[in-house]
Amino acid sequence: MVSNINQLLVQARTAYDAADWSSLIQYLQQLILGADSEHPEIVKNQEYLLTLTLSMLEMGDFQQRWEITKVLTHLGKIAIPPLIDILKDEDAEEELRWYAARTLGEFQHPEAIAPLVELLKTDEDEELKAIATTALGQMGTVAITSLTELLLDEDTRLLAVRSLSCIPQPETITPLLSVVQDPQAAIRAAAIEALSSFHDQRVPPVLLNALDDIAATVRRAAVLGLGFRPDLREALDLVTKLQPKLYDFNIDVCCAAAVSLSRMSCDDAAKHLFDLLISPQTPITLQLETIRALVWVGTPSSLEYLQTAFNQITSETLWQEIVTVLGRVQKPQTTLAVEILLQILQSQHPATEIANIKSAIALSLGQLGKMQAIEPLILLLADSNASVRLHAIAALKNLDSEAAHQKLQQLVNNAALTLDLHQGIAIALAEW
């Protein structure tokens, strides 16, 4: 064992002297990441291994540096002081300082907090400060006190909020609440977004208040945050509170409101979404978001609203979106979704003359997996458009490949079928 370790140490030194960084990484990984990393001989040579590892960090390329940081973290806290020195060295290569900051965050050690905090206060490199922000967030609860102090300084407040948002611990709630009324909209939005991940009684009143914030980014964060609390739907009358945001001045807020209402999973929410969808004043991007939201509501009424909307609107883009999202419906509403698609397919609706929409219907029927769609899909094999026929074949295979194949074989010699359907069935069987 000792001889093998000594051999690896010699090989590592030889690779270092030859500037063979790829080999050096391999030897260091075997020594430090291997099963024998706690062996007394390796522990005795830790300082030497640290020297080699740091030289690798300084001299390696991007990928080699990425790999060597894993070795550094396994060396333990002896690696922290030299990494701090690199971080503080303003003359050091930017990428090297980037790696030092990132690696310090992975240690989650109190010693690493102060230099990262100091960097946020004094350094002008925005990218490096972003890395330090993430690193502090990785440290978890040990960094909360230092980050809370950074909230007091206007210059570091936003970065501190971003770091706190990376720490999913309830201890961050109080410091985050302290900045929800900050003059800077970016800080208010970041704090509200972070608070939204906590099911704490102090948070919902803040989110409700922020619905009317002057800044759209803050309103959007509040809308999305409330969407994560369907458990409070009735207690806080969330559907009524969120509905006006469907008509916000900012379309991003409107889209967020559609998503959040969909999470309420109730008929009232579906009705509000339907009203928005069929309004002639609604921009098409918001209509598309609303169509998706109606599917996410997941109630029979929400799917029926989609069918009603399909018959009222005249946009080919919206028609296609409706038949596409119906294919993503989950149980227990899959049967209803299939029935709606089949009714559309068998109707005289102008959309059924459009190849792209027929293809989308076929695809959705295949995704829903209901056998009642087999015969209507077989009829699509007679379509004059090759894309429609191919989508019908794919859908039949997706439903039940064996059952569909048997059905086609039964029909292949049926003299009552049209020539187009005969040809379509023959092509489908050849594709099987």
Q: PLM features: residue spans?
A:
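Structural detector for internal amphipathic alpha-helices that build alpha-solenoid repeat scaffolds
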Residues: 10-14, 26-44, 64-77, 95-109, ...
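N-terminal "cap/leader" segments of large eukaryotic alpha-helical scaffolds
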Residues: 1-29, 35-36, 47-59, 66
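Alpha-helical adaptor scaffolds
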Residues: 346-363, 375
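Amphipathic alpha-helical scaffolding segments comprising HEAT/armadillo-like alpha-solenoid repeats
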Residues: 5-9, 40-58, 77-89, 109-122, ...
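Short inter-helical turns and helix N-cap capping residues of alpha-solenoid HEAT/ARM repeat scaffolds
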Residues: 17-20, 60-61, 90-93, 123-125, ...
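TPR/TPR-like (Sel1-like) alpha-helical repeat modules
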Residues: 29-33, 409-416
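Short amphipathic alpha-helical interaction patches enriched in hydrophobic/aromatic residues
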Residues: 226, 326, 348-349, 415
